[in-house]
Amino acid sequence: MAQYSAEFKQAKVLVLGDVMLDRYWFGATNRISPEAPVPVVRVQENEERAGGAANVAMNIASLNVSVQLMGLIGQDETGSALSLLLEKQKIDCNFVALETHPTITKLRILSRHQQLLRLDFEEDFNNVDCKDLLAKLESAVKNYGALILSDYGKGTLKDVQKMIQIARKANVPVLIDPKGTDFERYRGATLLTPNMSEFEAVVGKCNTEEEIIKKGLKLISDIELTALLVTRSEKGMTLLRPNQEPYHLPTVAKEVFDVTGAGDTVISVLATALADGRSFEESCYLANVAAGIVVGKLGTSTVSTVELENAIHARPETGFGIMSEAELKDAVAQAKARGEKIVMTNGCFDILHPGHISYLENARKLGDRLIVAVNSDDSVKRLKGESRPINNLENRMAVLAGLASVDWLVPFTEDTPQRLIGEILPDLLVKGGDYKPEEIAGSKEVWANGGDVKVLNFENGCSTTNVIEKIKLLKD
């Protein structure tokens, strides 16, 4: 197999479709209401996530790719909340705000990881004049390498034929995750990505691989597509194109926690790769790998370039996890959702020695994941003196990344990791040496969050300073 990469240097993607705000209320359920036979949920946390076409844009932004999002929202609080959420991820929002309709919002109430109720706030946009949206599309589409039309059947894409023609006139490929059984409305699109049930609802039941291929190629011909990608759940996905062999990819998911938004991930990565100049085969391969990652997460989620790169090269998360703070926060949230215990430590780790190895192995045994926060070069210099560090940050983190005991690495620039620890809030904070727990940076934040703090012993005689002194003696 070719050496594929999750780095998309040239890609720019435009997304247009049904944007939504997903709200989650989490709480404990310990009793039944005296008013009616329903559980009482004591809400303890709440969360907001981008849904629909907005989740597609979030998926693209998580790949460090330039993305613009177009759609219809209301002139309301939820529209403002959605816009703010997206802008924080550097997504260029180009919405048409309506006085007549609310922003589509879905509120889910959960307890102990079980969804108890979903409340939908919406009115379809089928009676809305979309001329302003079409004008925005015509003005912007020529600046992008791919257009995704994200259809959730809410009416934003009622003029989908006009949208396809605008993009094709600008020589921009159009990818659509279809909705409903009227695929004729998508005539002339570059590629559709129906799941198996959506595909069979249009072409009829397929009992064999041959039937899928035959009916898929006929659909391509009937509605003038360039290609068709059928996503087939546990059977992977199949790419069909006229006069070419079918390209089948088996599923790569190891464990399925939630399929919410998996289709969004597929079309996001697929469009991003095509916009970056990749082939259909490589683009589908990357999309399939990304889908395998995202179904292992809880709720509507995205895939980072680190996760995708690791999966492409069959790297386990353990031992290869150099991350930005934002990527780490996402990884920790997903791990906690799976019930994993997060352990965190920090240090300079200038010259790695047996004491470090033993310490990190012991720390890792205390939980399911170990985070190592590493002082930046300037931070080490302030703490240790002008002659340090011996090894720069990049090299120090690369060496630590090779240890099986280390799950994730993150740099910090301050003298202490107190702020970072307060953001990550591990279940257990550990530090080596003769500290008292209350003296450890970040201990107050961890305790306040219900976590614990533990001091581990270092091996006697093992220190970076001792190593440096021995080297000096050899030199003399």
From Swiss-Prot:
Binding site for ATP: N195, M196, S197, E198
Region described as Ribokinase: spans on this chain: 1-318
Nucleotide-binding as UniProt keyword: yes
Any Pfam family hit: CTP_transf_like
Stored InterPro entries: Bifunc_HldE (IPR023030), Cyt_trans-like (IPR004821), PfkB_dom (IPR011611), RfaE_dom_I (IPR011913), RfaE_dom_II (IPR011914), Ribokinase-like (IPR029056), Rossmann-like_a/b/a_fold (IPR014729)
GO MF assignments: ATP binding; heptose 7-phosphate kinase activity; heptose-1-phosphate adenylyltransferase activity; phosphotransferase activity, alcohol group as acceptor
Domain of life: Bacteria
Enzyme class: transferase
EC number(s) from the headed UniProt entry: 2.7.1.167, 2.7.7.70
Pathway: Nucleotide-sugar biosynthesis; ADP-L-glycero-beta-D-manno-heptose biosynthesis; ADP-L-glycero-beta-D-manno-heptose from D-glycero-beta-D-manno-heptose 7-phosphate: step 1/4; Nucleotide-sugar biosynthesis; ADP-L-glycero-beta-D-manno-heptose biosynthesis; ADP-L-glycero-beta-D-manno-heptose from D-glycero-beta-D-manno-heptose 7-phosphate: step 3/4
Active site per database record: D264
UniProt-listed GO biological process terms: ADP-L-glycero-beta-D-manno-heptose biosynthetic process
Reactions this protein catalyses: D-glycero-beta-D-manno-heptose 7-phosphate + ATP = D-glycero-beta-D-manno-heptose 1,7-bisphosphate + ADP + H(+); D-glycero-beta-D-manno-heptose 1-phosphate + ATP + H(+) = ADP-D-glycero-beta-D-manno-heptose + diphosphate
Region (Cytidylyltransferase): 344-476
Keywords in alphabetical order: ATP-binding, Carbohydrate metabolism, Kinase, Multifunctional enzyme, Nucleotide-binding, Nucleotidyltransferase, Transferase
GO cellular component term, pick one: cytosol
UniProt record similarity statement: In the N-terminal section; belongs to the carbohydrate kinase PfkB family.
Known role: Catalyzes the ADP transfer from ATP to D-glycero-beta-D-manno-heptose 1-phosphate, yielding ADP-D-glycero-beta-D-manno-heptose.
Quaternary organization: Homodimer.
UniProt protein name: Bifunctional protein HldE
Gene field: hldE
